[in-house]
Each structure stands twice: as C-alpha cells, then as structure tokens.
C-alpha cells in the first residue's frame, strides 16, 4: 500500500529524491495548449493607477482608443484592484475577433494614452507563452554576430562584355537560365530540376526569378541564382510584381489557414486569399479576401464568375495600389502603410474596369503631383455609359465622356501615358450587328481633348500601341456566320498620326491588310518593328514582320503620315502559342507550349526582321521568358547622341562580330595545324629511329627487301636479342553447312 502524507517516512522521501525522473520532454510533447478563445484577449500595461471610484471613468476613456481598431465594450474590460482598492496599472480586454486583437497590438502598442502614460499592448497568449518560468533566460546573453558576408550583385548579368541577354527555359521538370548566343547554341548559366511546381516569372526589371510552390513563392537572383527571399502563402496560384519590384501580390483560391507556430503569417491573414508583400523585408503589408468578376452582363441566368487578376493594380511610381469591387467602388491604398486613401473607397455605381497610367504624366496647366486613373461604367437605366479620368490623390474627375449603345469597353494606355485609347464595342439599335470605334484621350493637351476614330466597320479583336510612340495596330473581324465551320477572316490595320509641324496630328489609317487569320500583335519594346501573328490556331501559324519606318521609298499616298510601312518577311511556326521580344528589340522567339497542345513543342529564334536563326524542338516545353532589363541610366541627351553615332558604333560591332567568327575559324584551323604538326613530327621521329637501326645492322638506307629483313632477324637472334612476332589472322570466307 502506498504511504499517505501522514505516514510518509524520511526514508520514503530520500527514495523519491533518488528515483526522480526527468519528464521535461514529455511535458513539452503533451503540454496542454491554451483555449482558442484566448486569442481574442489582449493585456494593456502602462495605465494610470487610480482608485476604485475612478476605474469606470478610466475604462470609458480607454475605450475611445480601443474602438478605433476593433469592437469591445465596458463589460469586456477587466481592470483588477489590489488590497488598497487601487488599480494595478494594467487591464485585460476582450475583442470580438482574433483579427481585432492583432490589430490592437500592431496599432496601439507604444502609443500615448495621455502626456504621462504610454500604452503597452500584448496578446494574452503571447504573455502566457513567453512569460512562463524557464521560457526566458534570466541572464542576458548577447546575440552571436555572424561574420559579414558580401551579397551577390543582383544585376551582374548587365555587365556582360558582349551585351548578351538571358532567358529562362522551363521544360519537363527542369528550369534553366541561358545566355543568348545568336547563331550559336545557348550558353547555360544554371539548370535545375524541380525548381518550380507551377511556373516561373521574372520581376519587371529582371532582378529576381520567382518560382511558385505549394508552400509559397521564392525569389532567386545573383550570378549563381541563389535564394534571395521567400513568401509563405500556402497553395499560391498567381503572383504579380509592382512596377519597381518593391512589392509582390500573391493569390490562392484556398483561404489561408494559419498554422500554430507560423513565424510570418498571423491571425490577421486567416481566411484571406490575397497578400500584398514588402519584398525588402519579406513581410506581409496587408491581406484581403478576393472579389470575383462577372463574366458577362447579368441576364436571367446566374452570370458566371471569374478570377479578378491582377486583383491589385499599381500606379506608375508605386505610391498607390487600387482594387475594384465590380459594380460598386474602387479602393485606393497608400504605400507602404497600405491604408485606405482618405479612409474611404471611391463609390462608382456600375464600375466595370479601371487602369492606371503606366507613367507619371504632367498635364498642361497642372503643377501639383498626380497619378491618373481611367475607369468606365455601363449604361444603367436611362443613364449613358461613361468613361472617366480621375486624378489621385485628390480623387477629382478631370475628364468624362458619355457613350451610347455600348456592349463592352477596353482601356488601352500608351506606355508613356500620353494617350489612352478607349475601344468601344457598340451594338446597333436592333442589337443584331456590332462595330467598334476608338475614343482617344490626348492626356497632356489642355482640357484632355478626345479624338474619335469611327471609320471601322467591324469589331476590333486586338489593339496595341507602339511602345514610346504614337502609332498603333489593330485587328478587326466580321461577324461569325451561325453554323460555319471556319472562323471569319481578319483584317490588320496600321494607324499613324498626320505630319503637322512639331505637333502630333490626327490619327489616320495607313493601310489595311485583308483576308488574314491574324489574331495577335507583338510590338518591339523599342518600337518601330511589330510582329502580327496567328497564335493558338489549329490551321494557321503565320508571323508577319513589319517595319513602320522603312528607309526605302515611300508610297505617294502615305507621304503625309509619320510612318513608312513595309512587310519584311512572313514565316511560319507550326502550333505557335506565344511570341516574345527580347528587351533590346533585336530578337524574337516564337514558341509552342505543351500547356496548350502536345504537337511539336519547342521554340524558334528569329531576328527582328524575321530571319530564323535556330529551331529548337524541345520535349515537354512549357515556358520561354526573356530576362527584362531595367530602364537605361543614360539621359535623353546621351541617348540622342548614341542614336546620332549609331552607324559608327555599328561598324565597331560588325568588326567585333567578324573578329568573333575569325577567332572561331582560327581555333579550328589551329587545331588542325597542331594535329598535322604532331603527325609530321611522329613520322620524322620514326624515320630517324629506323635509320639508326639500319645503321646498327649494317643495312643500306634503301633496304626494305623481305629477304634482308629475314637475315636481319636471324642476326638479331644470334646477338641474343628477343624478337616479337605478330600473327594477324584474316577470315577470307565463311560458310555454314547443316548435317541432317
């Protein structure tokens, strides 16, 4: 029978001490976790010490602060008293949700309550977790300072002496980064298996390569493409960089479930789909629930939903980011705090889409800083459809345009923000036919005048501005005939402004190419050259390479236009799905991805003029991505000087190209010469040895007679030397006989 406390002897006590067992590992393993309900509690320290009769007054005063970050009440604030009926200087507060408790810690910790008291706010669970005995060392131990390690140069590829460009290639389960070597095979930089699970994506300036995994996103960079940052977003599916690479947006269809012990994600991210990250710190700025878009106008049937992506759109200078709640509002947030501009969203009834200007524009007569945002709303009741331009941060509408009989609208900004083209698809009054007209806003001109291009008779299916230019290309198509097996033909139209002294004239049609199958437009990033192609087609795969500033003779009918159009070459790439220009505008890659079809996957390299340099069939080819370059550091004057001396530079480049070819040819010739010289030297050496042997045996120089050789062999045997005979067997004829 086990002894009771009353009957416990001294011997029993000593035995207990001797047999004491260390249960620390089991305690750690089976430690009872705190109730989930405690994650709504916070502890507020730094409060004034007041008597019991003043406690309620202090609680009411404290609630003014607390209700700015969440919802709580007097009953949810517990302020304990000591034996002298005085408060202890702290209080326990319960919020409605864990997110509100987290917000209280983030926003109220360290803020002043009055001139003499500063609030110290902590989660109750954190105090319980870190305040237990043994969790924190009593003695201060200085942190170990790791030795300095020089970081890799994240833009080292720009220092390539031959000014080559890099590209990423995703095929099978391998991702590689290569140098482009023109006519020669690409030079491998790095090639890794299972580098990504979904896809890879370059950041806008080429600093980082992003890989996407079920655990989140990782950024790679430097000469060896080492890991730079990671962003834990479980089951992430889509990512988007800000224009200056300062921020990253990630999205997953699955709401986030924060696991206990997760170091970066907090309860504030619980249940959200979108996270906006700060790339420099690797920490989330804010998280959101995603909004779906309706796939079409609401009718009797429930409209289909589609993912709104990009969910957030960035201003050119990254000072603002905005998202749209379709049909209701646009919310504009200020960076880096991610607080709502003016603390309210911009209410816009029926809003369908919006786009920021891709560059900071200075309008005539406007001196203050602004970013421009363009949006459109459909016809609602008797109200017409509307396109409007808003100035941020003032939220002032600076230009509006009413539209009628509108089916759809697309907004196309020119890369410098000089124009925004509003592509308006209109239906006839009977709603049986469709046509498109263009409303072009001239942003920098006084009052933002609008030019209308209404000469188009068909529906525009694609539109693209020339980068850093004022010309555009569009593709139109007629209405599909019901039951027809073949899609209607398309027409490609080229537009340019009229010459008007120093000003930019009205936009006019240069030329229309009829009876095409083209459906895609790809401008060179430097302008001037454009590829008009047919992609994602099962029957047509043509690519037309056009020059908008051809240096040859200009047709008489086009002399008033700021362009000289010339088709340089037409080529085909079977099954082509994607076309990508390199960032310098020198090369074009056409590719056929296994993500679209599994027929003759691979990629082809072309010059800007359409000459095919190489064809690269690649099994299980998925992605080809040129590495972007950051904007040039040269001033406009320096760039102008470079263009002025381009012919002189071209001579140097041509000489370098010839030298490189000569070096390659010289290397081949030198190798052949070396092998020939080695052979000649060997022959000379063998002849010298043979002459010495003949001299030793007393044979004449021309003694090659077999009889003399036989006598020489006998002589060598007499002299006691060893003779090695080599027997060579040769099969003259071989037959097989079967004996029955």
Swiss-Prot record:
Q: Where in the cell is it found?
A: Cytoplasm
Disordered: annotated span = 1-20, 696-721
Which CDD domains does the UniProt record give? RRM_eIF3B
- Biased-composition ranges for Polar residues? 1-10
Q: Which SUPFAM superfamilies match?
A: RNA-binding domain, RBD (SSF54928), Tricorn protease domain 2 (SSF69322)
Q: Which UniProt keywords apply?
A: Cytoplasm, Initiation factor, Protein biosynthesis, Repeat, RNA-binding, WD repeat
Q: Where is the RRM domain?
A: 40-126
Single biological process term from Gene Ontology: formation of cytoplasmic translation initiation complex
Annotated Gene Ontology cellular components are:
cytoplasmic stress granule; eukaryotic 43S preinitiation complex; eukaryotic 48S preinitiation complex; eukaryotic translation initiation factor 3 complex; eukaryotic translation initiation factor 3 complex, eIF3e; eukaryotic translation initiation factor 3 complex, eIF3m; multi-eIF complex
What are the start and end residues of each WD repeat?
Answer: 193-230, 232-289, 302-343, 455-496, 513-556, 571-609
The main location is cytoplasm
Q: Which SMART domains match?
A: RRM (SM00360)
- Classify the source by domain of life: Eukaryota
Q: State one molecular function term (GO).
A: translation initiation factor activity
Q: What does this protein do, in the record's words?
A: RNA-binding component of the eukaryotic translation initiation factor 3 (eIF-3) complex, which is involved in protein synthesis of a specialized repertoire of mRNAs and, together with other initiation factors, stimulates binding of mRNA and methionyl-tRNAi to the 40S ribosome. The eIF-3 complex specifically targets and initiates translation of a subset of mRNAs involved in cell proliferation.
User: PANTHER family recorded for this chain?
Assistant: EUKARYOTIC TRANSLATION INITIATION FACTOR 3 EIF3 -RELATED (PTHR14068), EUKARYOTIC TRANSLATION INITIATION FACTOR 3 SUBUNIT B (PTHR14068:SF0)
The UniProt similarity line reads:
Belongs to the eIF-3 subunit B family.
The subunit structure is: Component of the eukaryotic translation initiation factor 3 (eIF-3) complex.
Q: What is this protein called?
A: Eukaryotic translation initiation factor 3 subunit B
Biological source species: Aspergillus fumigatus (strain ATCC MYA-4609 / CBS 101355 / FGSC A1100 / Af293)
Q: Which gene encodes it?
A: prt1
């Amino acid at each position: 029978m086990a002894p009771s406390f009353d009957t416990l002897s001294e011997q029993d006590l000593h035995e207990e001490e001797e047999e004491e067992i260390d249960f620390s590992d089991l305690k750690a393993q089976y430690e009872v976790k705190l109730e989930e309900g405690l994650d709504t509690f916070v502890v507020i320290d730094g409060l004034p010490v007041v008597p019991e009769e003043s406690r309620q007054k202090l609680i009411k005063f404290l609630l003014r602060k607390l209700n700015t970050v969440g919802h709580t009440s007097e009953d949810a604030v517990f302020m304990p008293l000591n034996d002298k009926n005085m408060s202890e200087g702290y209080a326990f507060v319960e919020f409605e949700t864990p997110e509100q408790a987290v917000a209280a810690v983030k926003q109220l910790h360290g803020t002043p309550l009055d001139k003499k008291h500063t609030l110290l706010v902590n989660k109750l669970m954190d105090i319980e977790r870190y305040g237990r005995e043994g969790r924190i060392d009593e003695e201060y131990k200085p942190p170990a300072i790791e030795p300095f390690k020089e970081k890799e140069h994240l833009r080292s590829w720009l220092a390539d002496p031959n000014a080559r460009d890099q590209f990423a290639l995703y095929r099978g389960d391998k991702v590689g980064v290569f140098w482009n070597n023109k006519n020669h095979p690409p030079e491998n930089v790095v090639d890794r298996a299972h580098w990504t699970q979904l896809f890879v994506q370059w950041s806008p300036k080429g600093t980082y390569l992003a890989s996407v995994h079920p655990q989140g996103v990782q950024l790679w960079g430097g000469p060896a493409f080492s890991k730079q940052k990671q962003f834990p977003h479980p089951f992430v599916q889509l990512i988007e960089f800000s224009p200056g690479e300062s921020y990253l947006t990630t999205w997953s269809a699955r709401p986030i479930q924060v696991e206990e012990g997760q170091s970066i994600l907090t309860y504030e991210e619980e249940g959200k789909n979108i996270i906006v990250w700060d790339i420099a710190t690797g920490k989330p700025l804010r998280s959101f629930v995603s909004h779906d878009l309706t796939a079409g106008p609401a009718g009797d049937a429930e409209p289909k939903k589609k993912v709104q992506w990009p969910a957030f759109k960035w201003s050119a200078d990254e000072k603002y980011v905005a998202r749209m709640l379709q049909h209701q509002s646009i919310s504009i947030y200020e960076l880096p705090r991610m607080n709502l501009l003016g603390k309210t969203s911009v209410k816009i009834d029926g809003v369908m889409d919006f786009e920021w200007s891709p560059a900071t524009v200075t309008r005539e007569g406007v001196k203050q800083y602004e970013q421009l945002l363009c949006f459109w709303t459909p016809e609602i009741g008797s109200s017409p459809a509307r396109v409007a331009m808003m100035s941020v941060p003032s939220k002032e509408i600076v230009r509006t345009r009413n539209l009628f009989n509108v089916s759809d609208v697309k907004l196309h900004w020119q890369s410098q923000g000089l124009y925004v083209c509003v592509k308006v698809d209109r239906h006839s009054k009977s709603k049986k036919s469709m046509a498109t007209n263009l409303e072009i806003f001239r942003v920098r001109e006084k009052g933002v005048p609008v030019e209308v291009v209404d000469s188009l008779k068909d529906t525009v299916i694609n539109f693209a501005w020339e980068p850093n230019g004022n010309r555009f290309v569009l593709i139109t198509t007629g209405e599909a005939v019901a039951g027809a097996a073949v899609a209607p033909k398309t027409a490609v139209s080229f537009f340019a402004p009229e010459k008007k002294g120093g000003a930019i004239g009205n936009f006019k049609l240069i030329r229309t190419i009829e009876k095409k199958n083209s459906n895609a437009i790809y401008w060179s990033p430097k302008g001037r050259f454009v590829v008009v192609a047919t992609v994602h087609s099962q029957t047509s795969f043509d690519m037309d390479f056009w020059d908008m500033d051809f240096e040859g003779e200009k047709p008489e009918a086009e002399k008033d236009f700021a362009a000289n159009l010339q088709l340089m070459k037409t080529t085909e790439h079977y099954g082509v799905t994607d076309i990508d220009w390199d960032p310098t505008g020198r090369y074009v890659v056409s590719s056929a991805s296994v993500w679209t079809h599994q027929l003759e996957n691979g990629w082809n390299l072309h010059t800007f003029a359409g000459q095919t340099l190489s064809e690269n069939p690649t099994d299980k080819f998925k992605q080809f991505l040129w590495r972007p370059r950051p904007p040039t550091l040269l001033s406009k004057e320096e760039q102008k000087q470079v263009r002025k001396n381009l012919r002189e530079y071209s001579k140097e480049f041509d000489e370098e190209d010839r030298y490189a070819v000569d070096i390659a040819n010289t290397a081949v010739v030198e190798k052949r010469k070396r092998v020939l010289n080695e052979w000649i030297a060997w022959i000379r050496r063998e002849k010298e040895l043979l002459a010495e042997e003949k001299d030793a045996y007393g044979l004449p120089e021309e003694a090659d007679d077999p009889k003399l050789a036989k006598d020489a062999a006998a002589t060598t045997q007499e002299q006691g030397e060893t003779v090695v005979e080599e027997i060579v067997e040769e099969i003259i004829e071989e037959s097989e006989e079967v004996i029955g």
